[in-house]
From Swiss-Prot:
Domain notes: The flexible hinge domain, which separates the large intramolecular coiled coil regions, allows the heterotypic interaction with the corresponding domain of SMC6, forming a V-shaped heterodimer.
Protein name: Structural maintenance of chromosomes protein 5
SUPFAM superfamilies (UniProt xref): P-loop containing nucleoside triphosphate hydrolases (SSF52540)
Main location, first listed in the record: nucleus
Top-level taxonomic group: Eukaryota
Residue stretches in coiled coil: 182-431, 617-798
Location of the Zinc-hook domain: 23-991
Gene Ontology process terms (BP): DNA recombination; DNA repair; sister chromatid cohesion
Family: Belongs to the SMC family. SMC5 subfamily.
GO CC terms in record: chromosome; cytosol; nucleus; plasmodesma
Organism: Arabidopsis thaliana (Mouse-ear cress)
Stated role: Core component of the SMC5-SMC6 complex that promotes sister chromatid alignment after DNA damage and facilitates double-stranded DNA breaks (DSBs) repair via homologous recombination between sister chromatids.
């Protein structure tokens, strides 16, 4: 078969057979299935083969992510963190691209971590993703183009591409880089063209309609303008009307101002007359004040004289009273002397009687011994009472402490019971919707059970070390946590009957006395591997609950290790431990029933969602026991307190009786002493009284003394009478003087009153004048304000200008005439009738619309012409080139398809100016009797679509402008014949001089295939025994180079 020529010139290959942009090395670390991988692909066709799951697609994902692709285009995980190898925090991908020369290598490095963060480097320097994208765009690398980069998970998407999408992808992948640019520009221009055509048609129609309406309205508009002329004249007259009213207000203001000045003049004359009448009155008031002052002085002398006279009269009355008292005292003295002798006789008799009574009173001896005995007994009782009080206080303090401790215990129990509610809520949130109802039913009906019933199991289990909770929860199935456990068959039947509606399991524990529990022992070897506990030892629960968990889930065979155990899992398995947990993973080994082969599984450890909500069951039981102990202790102490209180009350009553007896003895002693003291005091008082009566002075001396006192009092009375006479004469003189001056003052007051009456009449007249002035002022102010308002109103209507003043001169000069003229013009305007009041506005608005739309229409026509020229220009550049490109693809595709099937063709679907509808149709025929059908899932099988797809991609090989192409498992579903033909096509295409680098990933290859030097095979092997061989191949040597070395070695030997 003759070689077909290349369709267009390519960049020549270098001496190393690589093109610029080819991938020369791929390095992966902690990426998907690989710990570390270094791959050096060939320059042409690279067959990446390996079993399913070995990591072929990992290589595709690495190329896409390192060359700026997003996770979404791979059709797998949507975040870069998902591509980090499981169990690792970060990984990286490094790809080396061939530069423009053999020595120039471009290294792109991308580091990713589980937090979805990326770090980019180019040739060892940190850069941004934008810089990386710019670099790969220089080589036309498009990882988002399905014709260049077809991952396994997006193969089906390529077959689903519509003709329009297929054309877009083909333009990006092959041909002139300006093709997709011109296509997008044509699509945008065609949209603009359609919009402009619609706008021109719409505006032309609107313009014609508006012109027809304007022609109909012209006659009505002329009548409206005539009416507007009359109304304009009315408006001009209305402008003069407020100025005429302003002139009238101004004349009224000037008249009011004149009247105000006349009133002010009259007020000034009245004020002068009033001041001339006030001067004589002031002189009379001054003279009256001097007369009143003299009257006041005489009045003061009269008052002083009266006070002196009153003082003398008082003294005279006092002296008269002394005389009368002295005479009475003389008479009383005579009577007292007669009674004194009688009192002396009576006092002598009383003294003798008191002395006799005191001598006859017996002597009282106090019972001291009895009192001391009673005091001693009372003291002892008080000591006993104080002891009981101290005991009671100590008991009260201890009782208070116990009650406080009990309250704390009860509060803690409530908190822990609330924690049980949290556990029940966690179960409800996990799917056990009615677990609360089941729990409450069991609690309310516990009296009906024969033996203890436990449940839900989650409430009964306590994990002291919370770090172990995730292991136990991960090992035990969820259904067990919501289960109830009975220990009697009848209890089980009762629970099943009543809890069935709540959807909770019921398990019956019958005991397991026959089986002995395996002892827990950690050997030194296990401890060295990090094993430190067994799963059945990490939690506390009632025996029945624990036995059920052990029997159901084999907790005795599951161990707990550390991070060291993670690293030495294989050694742990060799000890016979087939199930163990580490902080991050759960390891399990199982043996095949047939061949006895062992297989291992590793699962991640997830955070506990149920057990970490729980409480310590042991602590809960301790708190309940402690609560009962405290309640018993408090009850005992309360009884003790009551007995101490009773004993104290008895001792206090006994002490009160003794105290009362002692008080009675003391009272008797006190009364006897008091009685003797009273008799002695009575005797002494009577003796003193007798001596006092005997020592009273003589009667004659007292009478002489009283007569002398009466004589002195009579002399004082005479002196007072003489002085009183002098004061009476002086008082008469003062009275006469006061009367004269007072009459003169009354006369002056009368004259002043008459003058003031006259002045008041003048003041009233002046006040009336003042009110008249104020009224005139207010009138002027009112006129002034109305004048200012009239001026503002007039100015708001129109400002006087020379032109307006000239118009005003032609109008009537009075308000009445002007108003009549306004009414005449309004009548004439109103006589012009028309149907549409807004006819003028509509006419002017339509004229404006006609102008706007005409301008817009001219602009749109001009833009339409320019747009059509631009489209024609772009179309001449784009369509011939595209037709030629599709023709070349069709030529290659038809030739390749004839070798594999019956017939196939690629055609361009042209849609005139609907450039967004242009597309590429792939039509194929696999049977001679059939017809060419468009490639789709309705007409072809999966294998036929795969053959068609790969042949289309091969047809693009020698037209492509990209450095490499990736196709993942495109031969899946092909029959052996088509697969062999397809492979030969790929090998032949790869042998072309300028064919781009190609990666073909497949899990299978047919035997006896023909290979060429342009074909490189990358065999991916993965598994537990690949570590040692990978070290041998770490240099990246190929099988061919190894064979050459062996041949050379054999020749040398």
């Amino acid at each position: 078969m003759s070689e077909r020529r290349a369709k267009r010139p390519k960049i020549s290959r270098g001496e190393d057979d690589f093109l610029p942009g080819n991938i020369i090395e791929i390095e992966l670390h902690n990426f998907m299935t690989f710990n570390h991988l270094v791959c050096k692909p060939g320059s042409r066709l690279n067959l990446v083969i390996g079993p399913n799951g070995s990591g072929k697609s990992s290589l595709v994902c690495a190329i896409a992510l390192c060359l700026g692709g997003e996770p979404q285009l791979l059709g797998r995980a949507t975040s870069v963190g998902a591509y980090v190898k499981r169990g690792e925090d970060s990984g990286y991908v490094k790809i080396s691209l061939r530069g423009n020369t053999r020595e120039e290598n471009l290294t792109i490095f991308r580091k990713i971590d589980t937090r979805n963060k990326s770090e980019w480097m180019f040739n060892g320097s940190t850069v941004s993703k934008k810089d990386i994208v710019e670099i790969i765009q220089k080589f036309n690398i498009q990882v988002n183009n399905l014709t260049q980069f077809l991952p396994q998970d997006r193969v089906c998407e390529f077959a689903k591409l519509t003709p329009v999408q297929l054309l877009e992808e083909t333009e990006k992948a092959v041909g002139d880089p300006q093709l997709p640019v011109h296509h997008r520009a044509l699509v945008e221009k065609s949209r603009d063209l359609k919009q402009l055509e619609r706008a021109v048609a719409k505006n032309g129609e609107t313009l014609n309609q508006l012109k027809a309406l304007v022609d109909e309205q012209e006659k009505d508009v002329e009548r409206v303008r005539q009416r507007e002329l009359f109304l304009t004249k009315v408006d001009s007259m209305k402008k003069k009307l407020p100025w005429l009213k302003y002139d009238m207000k101004k004349a009224e203001y000037m008249d009011a101002k004149k009247r105000m000045k006349e009133a002010e003049k009259k007020l000034d004359e009245a004020a002068k007359n009033l001041n001339s009448m006030k001067e004589p009155i002031e002189k009379q008031k001054k003279e009256k004040a001097e007369t009143d002052s003299k009257c006041k002085k005489v009045k003061n002398l009269m008052d002083a004289n009266g006070r002196n006279r009153c003082h003398l009269l008082e003294k005279e009355d006092e002296a008269d009273a002394r005389v009368v008292a002295t005479y009475k005292e003389l008479e009383e003295l005579k009577k007292q002397e007669e009674h004194r002798q009688e009192r002396i006789l009576k006092a002598t008799e009383d003294l003798v009687a008191a002395e006799r009574e005191l001598q006859n009173l017996p002597v009282y001896e106090r019972p001291v011994a009895k009192l001391e005995e009673l005091s001693s007994q009372v003291t002892e009782l008080h000591h006993s009472i104080n002891g009981k009080k101290n005991q009671k206080e100590d008991n009260e303090k201890l009782l208070s402490q116990k009650r406080y401790t009990l309250r704390q215990c009860v509060d803690k129990l409530k908190d822990m019971e609330n924690a049980n509610n949290k556990l029940l809520k966690a179960l409800a949130n996990s799917g056990a919707d009615r677990i609360f109802d089941a729990y409450q039913w069991v609690q309310q009906n516990r009296h009906e059970f024969k033996r203890e019933v436990y449940g839900p199991v989650l409430v009964e289990v306590n994990v002291p070390n919370r770090e172990n909770a995730c292991f136990l929860e991960g090992h035990v199935s969820f259904y067990i946590w919501k289960s109830f456990i009975t220990q009697d068959p009848e209890d089980r039947d009762l629970l099943v009957k009543n809890l069935k509606r709540f959807d909770v399991p019921v398990l019956n524990y019958v005991g397991n006395s026959g089986n002995q529990k395996a002892p827990f022992h950690i050997s030194d070897q296990m401890r060295s591997l990090g094993i430190h506990a067994r799963l059945d030892q990490i939690f506390d629960a009632p025996d029945a609950v624990k036995e059920v968990l052990n029997s159901q889930f084999g907790l005795e065979d599951s161990y707990i290790g550390s991070k060291i155990t993670d690293q030495r899992a294989e050694e742990v398995y060799k000890l016979g431990i087939k199930d163990f947990w580490t902080p991050d993973n759960h390891y399990r080994w199982s043996s095949s029933r047939y061949g006895g082969h062992s297989s291992a599984s590793v699962d991640s450890v997830y955070q506990s969602r149920l057990l970490l909500c729980g409480v310590d069951v042991g602590e809960l039981e301790k708190l309940r026991s402690r609560k009962e102990e405290l309640e018993d202790s408090i009850l005992f102490m309360e009884e003790t307190h009551k007995s101490l209180q009773t004993e104290q009350r008895r001792l206090e009553e006994e002490a009160a009786k003794l105290h009362k007896e002692r008080e009675e003895i003391v009272n008797v002693s006190y009364l006897e002493k008091k009685k003797r003291r009273e008799l002695e005091s009575r005797y002494q008082q009577r003796k003193t009284k007798l001596e006092s009566l005997e020592q009273e002075e003589d009667m004659d001396a007292s009478v002489a003394k009283l007569i002398d006192q009466a004589s002195r009092a009579n002399a004082d009375r005479y002196t007072y009478a003489i002085n009183l006479k002098k004061l009476l004469v002086e008082a008469v003189a003062h009275k006469w003087s006061y009367a004269e001056k007072h009459m003169a003052s009354i006369e002056l007051e009368r004259k002043i009153r008459e003058s003031e009456i006259n002045i008041k009449q003048y003041e009233k007249t002046a006040q009336q004048l003042s009110l008249a002035v104020e009224y005139c002022k207010k009138e002027v102010e009112g006129k002034q304000q109305r004048l200012a308002t009239a001026k503002r109103d007039a100015e708001s209507v129109a400002t006087i200008t020379p032109e307006l003043k000239k118009e005003f001169m032609e109008m009537p000069t009075t308000v009445e005439e002007l108003e009549a003229a306004i009414q005449d013009n309004l009548s004439q305007a109103n006589s012009i009738l028309f149907i549409n009041e807004n006819i003028l506005q509509e006419y002017e608005h339509r004229q404006s619309q006609i102008y706007t739309i005409s301008t817009k229409l001219e602009t749109d026509k001009r833009d339409l012409s320019i747009c059509m020229k631009e489209i024609d220009s772009l179309k001449e550049k784009w369509l011939p080139t595209l037709r030629q490109l599709v023709g070349q693809i069709n030529e290659t595709f038809s030739h390749n398809f004839q070798e594999m099937a019956v017939a196939g063709e690629v055609s361009l679907d042209e849609r005139d100016t609907d450039f967004d509808q242009y597309g590429i149709h792939i039509k194929v025929k696999f049977r001679e009797s059939g017809q060419l059908q468009v490639l789709s899932s309705h007409h072809q099988s999966g294998g036929e679509r795969s053959v068609s797809t790969i042949l289309y991609l091969v047809s693009l090989q020698d037209l492509t402008n990209c450095p490499f192409r990736v196709v993942d498992e495109i031969n899946q579903g092909m029959d052996p014949i088509n697969e062999r033909k397809m492979f030969q096509q790929l090998v032949r295409a790869a042998s072309q001089p300028n064919t781009p680098q190609c990666f073909l990933l497949t899990p299978k290859l047919l035997p006896e295939l023909e290979y060429s030097e342009a074909c490189s095979i990358l065999n991916i092997m993965n598994g537990p025994y690949i570590a040692e061989p990978s070290k041998v191949w770490s240099l990246g040597d190929s099988w061919g180079s190894l064979n050459r070395r062996r041949t050379e070695a054999s020749q040398c030997s």
